């Protein structure tokens, strides 16, 4: 079902569009969490540390593809809002070839650089063997990440957030079943967890590609070389590259912090691995709502409905902040039971450190909720450069403070650097909005 976000109730249209996206990402988090949970409970702390560190690296690599697809998706939304089908077809063709090229290049580089990662990430020797094996298999799934994100970006741009949910649901269920079978039944260690994830990724990627190509004639223009226009290639590169930079800078900062975390040893690594999964799961709905809000703004910006944009912005802030307050309270109260899901009850030190992490981060989710709205707003209004600026402020602050504070107060300094970065970026983004409001829309 395609949804025109330029008409009807603002709150209803945003929520109806956002809910399938939120459910889809919940499922995606489920098959990320499946690896962590099963590995943590059945393979021990070193395996958990290996999978956790690998997840941070893979998040960085896939963020490059995700950023390119998100930037292209914003352009698709604008063209859909304008009703310009010719430009939409040309954007689809240009973006497909460009992002496919980047994906192939990224996949080759990831294998070539695999052996150098231990030094860069400061991975302890007792963890590296499992991590190397896990990453080698996971890298095979990078093309599947491209397929899913490219075709889902088109579907969401035209207001269809339900179909991507279907394919993620199948993928998530399959991943969990295969995780249990490969790790517990066949005793395949961390390699089994990686294989389960890769198989699930290809099921969702190939499935959504076949569906979209079959049901939407516009998308079949990606094979039409006559739709590959030079000006559209430049447009896609200039627009999506900035969104890619935003996503990759954000995750590069996290990756740099991962290296610092690794220097504190397997206990802190394992606590961070579990805590990050819970953290991402907790604020993921406001991240998805920010992406849905971005599509809403982009469609209405293309249709030149500025009053609807202003009303939508006010509604989005209220919805996002209300959710953040609720989820902050829940994470703060239930931090210990949440950590116990991922870590054996006998690993007291890991649980204690994870609880400390969650309570510091969870108390300030309103900061990240506001930041996701600002990212979505500036991307939709054709100002992805501002999203990059906010990301650099947020992550730059996080990295610098993490190294400074950890040398003074220990590992807690790393945890405190995160919310400080969020709020500095929020302040910058809000000041820019106030100063440029009349120019934006």
Report each predicted region and the residues it spans.
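Residue-level signal for short hydrophobic patches within transmembrane helices
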Residues: 7, 11-30, 34, 57-64, ...
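Small-residue-rich hydrophobic transmembrane alpha-helices
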Residues: 48-108, 145-164, 271-335, 368-382, ...
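Hydrophobic transmembrane alpha-helices of multi-pass small-molecule transporters
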Residues: 60-63, 175-179, 205-209, 281-284, ...
């Amino acid at each position: 079902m395609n949804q025109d976000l330029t008409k009807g109730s603002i709150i209803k249209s945003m929520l109806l569009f956002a809910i399938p996206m939120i459910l889809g990402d919940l499922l995606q988090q489920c098959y990320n969490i499946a690896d962590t949970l099963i590995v943590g409970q059945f393979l021990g702390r070193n395996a958990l540390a290996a999978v956790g560190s690998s997840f941070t690296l893979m998040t960085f690599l896939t963020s490059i593809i995700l950023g390119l697809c998100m930037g292209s998706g914003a352009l698709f939304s604008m063209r859909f809002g304008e009703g310009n089908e010719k430009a939409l077809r040309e954007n689809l063709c240009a973006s497909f070839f460009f992002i496919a090229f980047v994906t192939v290049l990224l996949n080759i580089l990831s294998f070539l650089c695999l052996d150098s990662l231990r030094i860069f990430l400061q991975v302890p020797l007792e963890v590296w063997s499992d991590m190397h094996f896990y990453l080698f298999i996971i890298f095979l799934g990078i093309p599947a990440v491209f397929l899913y994100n490219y075709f889902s970006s088109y579907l969401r741009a035209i207001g269809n957030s339900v179909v991507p949910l279907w394919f993620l649901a199948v993928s998530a269920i399959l991943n969990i079943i295969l995780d249990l079978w490969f790790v517990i039944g066949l005793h395949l260690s961390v390699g089994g967890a990686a294989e389960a994830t890769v198989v699930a990724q290809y099921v969702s990627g190939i499935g959504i590609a076949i569906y979209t190509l079959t049901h939407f004639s516009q998308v079949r223009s990606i094979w039409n070389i006559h739709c590959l226009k030079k000006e559209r290639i430049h447009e896609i590169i200039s627009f999506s590259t900035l969104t890619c930079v935003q996503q990759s800078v954000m995750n590069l900062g996290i990756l740099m912090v991962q290296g610092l975390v690794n220097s504190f040893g397997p206990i802190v690594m394992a606590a961070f691995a579990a805590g990050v999964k819970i953290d991402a799961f907790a604020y993921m709905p406001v991240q998805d709502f920010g992406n849905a809000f971005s599509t809403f703004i982009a469609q209405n910006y293309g249709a030149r409905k500025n009053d609807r944009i202003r009303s939508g912005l006010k509604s989005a802030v209220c919805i996002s902040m209300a959710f953040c307050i609720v989820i902050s309270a829940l994470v703060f109260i239930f931090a210990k039971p949440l950590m116990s899901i991922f870590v054996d009850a006998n690993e007291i030190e890991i649980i204690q450190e994870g609880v400390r992490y969650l309570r510091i981060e969870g108390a300030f989710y309103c900061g990240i909720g506001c930041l996701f709205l600002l990212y979505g707003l500036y991307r939709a209004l054709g100002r992805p450069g501002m999203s990059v600026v906010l990301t650099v402020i947020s992550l730059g602050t996080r990295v610098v403070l993490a190294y400074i504070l950890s040398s003074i107060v220990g590992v807690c300094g790393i945890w405190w650097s995160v919310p400080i970065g969020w709020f500095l970026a929020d302040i910058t983004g809000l000041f820019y909005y106030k100063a440029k409001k009349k120019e934006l829309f």
